[in-house]
A protein has these predicted regions:
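Soluble non-cytosolic domains of exported or imported proteins
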Residues: 11-20, 65-74, 122-126, 130
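Post-signal peptide N-terminal regions of Sec-secreted extracellular proteins
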Residues: 2, 55-56, 66-69, 155-158, ...
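Acidic, glycine-rich loop-and-strand cores that form catalytic or ligand-binding grooves
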Residues: 76-105
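Auxiliary, metal-adjacent structural segments of Zn-dependent hydrolase domains
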Residues: 2-58
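Structured segments of extracytoplasmic/periplasmic soluble domains
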Residues: 24, 28, 32, 78, ...
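Surface-exposed patches in mature extracellular/periplasmic domains of secreted proteins
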Residues: 30-42, 91-94, 143-151
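Active-site scaffold of zinc-dependent metalloenzymes
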Residues: 38-73, 79-86
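Metalloprotease/metallohydrolase-associated module, dominated by Zn2+-dependent proteases
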Residues: 99-169
């Protein structure tokens, strides 16, 4: 079972929040847990975004302090990217997700330059970011703050089915 590996920079109250949120995440992605590994989490005081995932080091930076609801959403969002980068089977879901979101099938899944530098309104158009925000809604039941990302009921069904290794809608 994959684990979160917590850096010494992570305070005790944040550790508790991370562990509880990880349990929620694994409850949804349990059927896929064998295709992604551990992830390291480092707490930082300054970061342009709330959180950032680096697939080359399998490390997530999280800006603290922050409200618990925002931290939970940021954790789940970046863990969704972790699954996306580590789980080869993730590609099985992409066309169904693009269809569910009403996007052309030839839409690039990710921005070639990454997405952290993009304006918020452009960031929300990237399928990979729509997927990650949809995962937030699936795992946490909703999104605790507004983003420009459009989530569809069909997208929620696709992500949920894929996470549980059920037939895609």
């Amino acid at each position: 079972m994959p684990r979160v590996v917590l850096d010494d920079s992570v305070a005790p109250d944040f550790r508790t929040l991370i562990q509880a949120t990880w349990v929620q995440f694994l409850n949804v992605f349990d059927a896929r847990a064998s295709c992604f590994g551990d992830i390291r989490i480092v707490a930082v005081k300054e970061l342009a975004d709330r959180a950032q995932y680096d697939p080359t080091t399998v490390t997530m930076l999280v800006r603290v302090p922050e409200r618990g609801s925002l931290l939970r959403a940021a954790l789940v969002h970046e863990w969704a990217h972790h699954v996306e980068f580590q789980c080869a089977a993730h590609s099985e879901m992409r066309l169904a997700f693009l269809d569910a979101q009403g996007m052309p099938r030839n839409t690039p899944w990710q921005s070639m330059q990454g997405s952290t530098h993009l304006p918020f309104y452009e960031w929300g158009k990237i399928p990979s970011e729509q997927y990650a925000e949809t995962v937030v809604a699936v795992v946490l039941g909703d999104r605790s703050f507004w983003t420009p990302v459009r989530i569809t009921d069909e997208g929620l069904r696709v992500v949920t089915a894929w996470a549980k290794k059920e037939p895609l809608p």
